[in-house]
Regions:
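Conserved helicase RecA-like core
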Residues: 1-232
């Protein structure tokens, strides 16, 4: 990670003077997490004449700072810009706190691949355990898992051995699994870009998909603002 790299640079163990190609992935996510100052410090130590590639789901203000400062005469490539866009249906489902577990279990048991998103690692682990306890095969994906467990669970989901994946936002970034029929926001995300990233796991490559957000009474105003920001 960039923090560890900066530590090694500060100790004199790593020198970036001879770097010819620099790749910045998930730039928008690093901006959201407040990591851009560290990224800039790393880039400042690479040769200005080298090749730099930046990958981002969005090009908003935070990412644009990197573009203007470090990319000279940049060329923009939009992945799948001409690909057919599938139909994505968005639904809000009002539930009480007492009903939430039963509703999530019913959604997870529906035919087809389903991804349920939670805000926290603990929430993902707890929900996975609850689903398995109800006889619904499910795997979890979050930051508390080691790499072997992450790979094993994702492979099981990818190959159809398990059709329900419970994930956190950060762990699920970069997941590319086709034919996800349903995305469930078990916990509404904190901001609209996370909502769009989560929802984008379905309706890919011309396929249709459904997105359901569970809303408890105390979340109504928060979710209404979220939908407006996401232009849903």
């Amino acid at each position: 990670c960039h923090g560890r790299l900066l530590d090694l640079m500060g100790q004199g163990h790593v020198i970036l003077d001879a770097i010819e190609i620099t790749v910045i992935d998930e730039a928008d996510h690093m901006a959201d997490m407040g990591f851009l100052p560290m990224v800039r410090r790393v880039l400042d130590k690479t040769p200005g004449q080298g090749q730099r590639m930046l990958f981002s789901a969005t090009l908003d203000a935070g990412v644009d700072v990197l573009v203007k400062r470090f990319l000279h005469s940049p060329v923009v490539h939009e992945a799948d810009s001409s690909a057919p866009v599938g139909e994505m249906e968005h639904h809000l489902l009002g539930v009480s706190a007492a009903e939430r577990g039963d509703v999530l279990a019913e959604l997870a048991a529906a035919p087809g691949r389903t991804i349920l998103f939670t805000r926290t690692k603990h929430g993902a682990k707890k929900l996975t355990k609850q689903l398995i306890g109800r006889g619904i095969p499910a795997v979890e994906l979050h930051g508390n898992l080691n790499q072997n467990a992450r790979t094993r669970n994702l492979d099981a989901f990818h190959h159809g051995l398990v059709e329900t994946l419970v994930a956190t936002d950060i762990a699920a970034r970069g997941i590319h699994v086709d034919d996800v029929a349903l995305v469930v926001h078990a916990d509404p995300p904190a901001e609209h870009k996370a909502y769009l990233h989560r929802s984008g796991r379905t309706a890919r490559a011309g396929q249709s998909g459904t997105v359901i957000t569970l809303v408890t009474p105390d979340q109504r105003h928060e979710v209404a603002a979220l939908m407006r920001a996401a232009k849903i």
